């Protein structure tokens, strides 16, 4: 997970303009049975972004937008909309195939409705 997070940050930095803030939506459970796992993962992502922000010289900053999806596909779709409204252009999720499929479906529909704004 840490290697994947670092790769995402590096790839995002390569595409971003100097001074830009890259917003990454983190959609996983922060409540219910998986709350402890989700809380730990979110803190990890935030620490990676914080560390990268301190060390990076490109002027690109990273912000993790953590949203509780309650491990529900429906909540995940709502969380994705909220994250996109907050300016997130990247999304990460790791717990549950139902939420993952909801993200894929929502992004495919969004991209079809908004060509060129993927």
Regions found by a protein language model. Give the residues of each.
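Cleaved targeting-peptide boundary
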Residues: 16-22
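Acidic/histidine-rich, surface-exposed loop or edge segments in extracytoplasmic proteins
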Residues: 25-33
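Bacterial N-terminal signal peptides that target proteins for export
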Residues: 1-3
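Beta-alpha junction/loop-to-helix N-cap segments that form part of ligand/metal-binding clefts
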Residues: 21, 36-40, 55-118
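Short catalytic helix/loop segments, enriched in acidic residues and glycine
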Residues: 42-53
């Amino acid at each position: 997970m840490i290697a994947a997070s670092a790769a995402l940050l590096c790839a995002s930095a390569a595409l971003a303009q100097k001074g830009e803030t890259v917003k990454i939506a983190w959609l996983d459970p922060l409540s219910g049975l998986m709350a402890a796992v989700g809380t730990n993962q979110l803190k990890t992502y935030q620490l990676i972004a914080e560390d990268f922000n301190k060390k990076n010289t490109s002027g690109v900053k990273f912000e993790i937008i953590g949203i509780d999806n309650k491990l529900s596909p429906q909540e995940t779709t709502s969380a994705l909309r909220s994250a996109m409204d907050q300016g997130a252009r990247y999304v990460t999720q790791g717990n549950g195939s139902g939420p993952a499929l909801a993200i894929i479906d929502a992004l495919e529909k969004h991209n079809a409705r908004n060509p060129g704004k993927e």
